[in-house]
């Protein structure tokens, strides 16, 4: 299998707040073949209303994919193409990669705030 057929997607955990905040993202690392789909789970236990999904490409700053201002209320950020989100409760904000592409090789972040 050639390297051109693989899409390496790196995941990271973003700690928000002054202490160890309760935001977790899983899996931390994953490699996908081009065309595969997967869901990045994000959970927070601080009862925050606002949640955000970002990506950071090599040598670039953070770019907002999607955000949510409350359960069941989501909106697109600057780079939503190829992704879907849902937020059925306050705690969870999963991000689904519909069909992995090499252009989605990135570090992904999840954050929450009041």
Swiss-Prot record:
Glycans are attached at residue 84. Disulfide bonds join 42-110. It is found in: Cell membrane. One of its GO terms (cellular component) is plasma membrane. Residues 22-114 form the Ig-like domain. InterPro entries: Ig-like_dom_sf, Ig-like_fold, Ig_V-set, TCR_beta_variable. It comes from the Eukaryota. One of its GO terms (biological process) is cell surface receptor signaling pathway. Residues 1-21 form the signal peptide. Its main location: membrane. The keyword Disulfide bond applies. Keywords: Adaptive immunity, Cell membrane, Disulfide bond, Glycoprotein, Immunity, Immunoglobulin domain, Membrane, Receptor, Signal, T cell receptor. SUPFAM superfamilies: Immunoglobulin. Probable non-functional open reading frame (ORF) of V region of the variable domain of T cell receptor (TR) beta chain. Non-functional ORF generally cannot participate in the synthesis of a productive T cell receptor (TR) chain due to altered V-(D)-J or switch recombination and/or splicing site (at mRNA level) and/or conserved amino acid change (protein level). Alpha-beta T cell receptors are antigen specific receptors which are essential to the immune response and are present on the cell surface of T lymphocytes. Alpha-beta TR is a heterodimer composed of an alpha and beta chain; disulfide-linked. The alpha-beta TR is associated with the transmembrane signaling CD3 coreceptor proteins to form the TR-CD3 (TcR or TCR). The assembly of alpha-beta TR heterodimers with CD3 occurs in the endoplasmic reticulum where a single alpha-beta TR heterodimer associates with one CD3D-CD3E heterodimer, one CD3G-CD3E heterodimer and one CD247 homodimer forming a stable octameric structure. CD3D-CD3E and CD3G-CD3E heterodimers preferentially associate with TR alpha and TR beta chains, respectively. This is Probable non-functional T cell receptor beta variable 6-7. The gene is TRBV6-7.
């Amino acid at each position: 299998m050639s390297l051109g057929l693989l899409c390496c997607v790196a995941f990271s955990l973003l700690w928000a707040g002054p202490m160890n905040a309760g935001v977790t993202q899983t899996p931390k690392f994953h490699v996908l073949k081009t065309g595969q789909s997967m869901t990045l789970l994000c959970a927070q236990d601080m009862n925050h209303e606002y949640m955000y999904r970002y990506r950071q490409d090599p040598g670039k700053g953070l770019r907002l994919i999607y955000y949510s201002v409350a359960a069941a209320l989501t909106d697109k950020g600057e780079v939503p193409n190829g992704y879907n989100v849902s937020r059925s409760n306050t705690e969870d904000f999963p991000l689904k990669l519909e069909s992995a592409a090499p252009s989605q090789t990135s570090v992904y972040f999840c954050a929450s705030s009041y």
